[in-house]
Amino acid sequence: MIITIDGPSGTGKSTLAKALAQTLQFLYCNTGAMYRTLAYARLQPDWQEVPLEDFLASPPFSFSFSKDSPLQAFYGDRLLTSELSSQEVANFASLFSKEPLVRAYMQTLQKQYATVGNCVFEGRDMGSKVFPHAEVKIFLTAKPEIRAERRLKDLPQGSLPKEALMAELIARDQADQQRECDPLVIPQDAIVIDSSDLTISQILEKILPLIPSHLT
C-alpha cells in the first residue's frame, strides 16, 4: 500500500509522515531529503562543472532504504544529516528539482523503493505525478506565518528573520506551482487538510479512519 503526503514547505509533512508510518508500521520515505541530497552533491566543487547527464550516470551520492531502516542519504561513504537542512542546499534543491532529467531520475528511484513494502511517501508531487494511483493521498496546507515559525525551528538560531523566511516560502510556493515539470498541485482524490491550528495527533485522528483496514 502507498500513502502520499504532499504540500508546500512548513505544513508539517515530515512530522505527519513519520508519525503515520510509525502508527501503521509502514516504511517512510522523505523525497525532499532525496532532492536535497542531489543538491548538496552538486554544490561540491568537484561536481559543479560536470555535465548533468554524467553527474546522474555516476552519482557521488547514494541512498539506503529497507524494511529495517528509513531512508538514509550518503555522499561517498559519509552519512548526510544536518548538511541537508542548510538554507543554501534547500534553495538550490528548489532550482535543481526543476530539471526534467533530475525529476525523471528521482521518480525512478522512488518507484523502486515502493516495491520494498507498504510505504508513506512525502513530497510535492507524490500523489499527482509519481504515485497517481496511491490508495490514500493527503495534501497539507497551512498559513504562511505558521509555516515560517515551523521552519525557523529547523534552522540555526538567527539564520533568518521570520518575515524574510515567510517571503522565501511564498516565493518557493509560486515557483513550485508555476514550474513546467511536475508542478505542485492538489492531487485528484486527495484529502486536503489545513494544519495551521492542528496538532499531529489531531491530523492523525482525521486520517486514520479514512484508511481501509484491509489495505494495512
Swiss-Prot record:
<dbReference type="GO" id="GO:0036431">
    <property type="term" value="F:dCMP kinase activity"/>
</dbReference>
<keyword id="KW-0547">Nucleotide-binding</keyword>
<dbReference type="Pfam" id="PF02224">
    <property type="entry name" value="Cytidylate_kin"/>
</dbReference>
<dbReference type="GO" id="GO:0005524">
    <property type="term" value="F:ATP binding"/>
</dbReference>
<keyword id="KW-0418">Kinase</keyword>
<dbReference type="InterPro" id="IPR003136">
    <property type="entry name" value="Cytidylate_kin"/>
</dbReference>
<dbReference type="GO" id="GO:0036430">
    <property type="term" value="F:CMP kinase activity"/>
</dbReference>
<protein>
    <recommendedName>
        <fullName>Cytidylate kinase</fullName>
        <ecNumber>2.7.4.25</ecNumber>
    </recommendedName>
</protein>
<dbReference type="InterPro" id="IPR011994">
    <property type="entry name" value="Cytidylate_kinase_dom"/>
</dbReference>
<feature type="binding site">
    <location>
        <begin position="7"/>
        <end position="15"/>
    </location>
    <ligand>
        <name>ATP</name>
    </ligand>
</feature>
<dbReference type="GO" id="GO:0005737">
    <property type="term" value="C:cytoplasm"/>
</dbReference>
<dbReference type="InterPro" id="IPR027417">
    <property type="entry name" value="P-loop_NTPase"/>
</dbReference>
<keyword id="KW-0067">ATP-binding</keyword>
<dbReference type="GO" id="GO:0006220">
    <property type="term" value="P:pyrimidine nucleotide metabolic process"/>
</dbReference>
<keyword id="KW-0808">Transferase</keyword>
<keyword id="KW-0963">Cytoplasm</keyword>
<comment type="similarity">
    <text>Belongs to the cytidylate kinase family. Type 1 subfamily.</text>
</comment>
